[in-house]
């Protein structure tokens, strides 16, 4: 009987160690830097954090018009702009095909920021303030840009996607 108990304890110890090893391997095999994440999935997180109903969703043509980005640079994106041209609100989450392209996309967005700054500086000071407080950042193959009163919440939702 004693030998049976000793064998049972060894078996239990082995199963416990096996569970720990499997758990460790599963925990270390997570996604790398959001590579499998889509712009739509990130947008869904942002929509849960802030209300985008008063903004218009943009298409590839609008993306090209605002940021001068070609289809060969962008793998996936979401774009929201203000419903009126007297508002500066914008939200863009752009997933580039290659992480090296993120910096050039960021430069194109900076040109858009400069153009909006000139447009709103004297015309609509409260909108100019929002442009000055914009959020522009990259994370892996993603470029995030937000001009809004709720830009901080949008940024937090973007960051939490990983």
Specify the residue positions occupied by each region the protein language model found.
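C-terminal motif of bacterial Sec signal peptides marking the signal peptidase cleavage site
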Residues: 23-27
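Stable alpha-helical elements in mature extracytoplasmic
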Residues: 38, 42, 59, 63, ...
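Bacterial N-terminal signal peptides that target proteins for export
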Residues: 2-15
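A short, solvent-exposed beta-edge/loop patch
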Residues: 83, 126-162
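Post-signal peptide N-terminal segment of mature Sec-exported envelope proteins
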Residues: 35-56
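Short Gly/Thr-rich strand-loop-strand
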Residues: 99-138
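A short acidic-to-branched-hydrophobic micro-motif
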Residues: 88-98
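Short, compositionally biased low-complexity segments enriched in polar/charged residues
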Residues: 57-86, 100-104
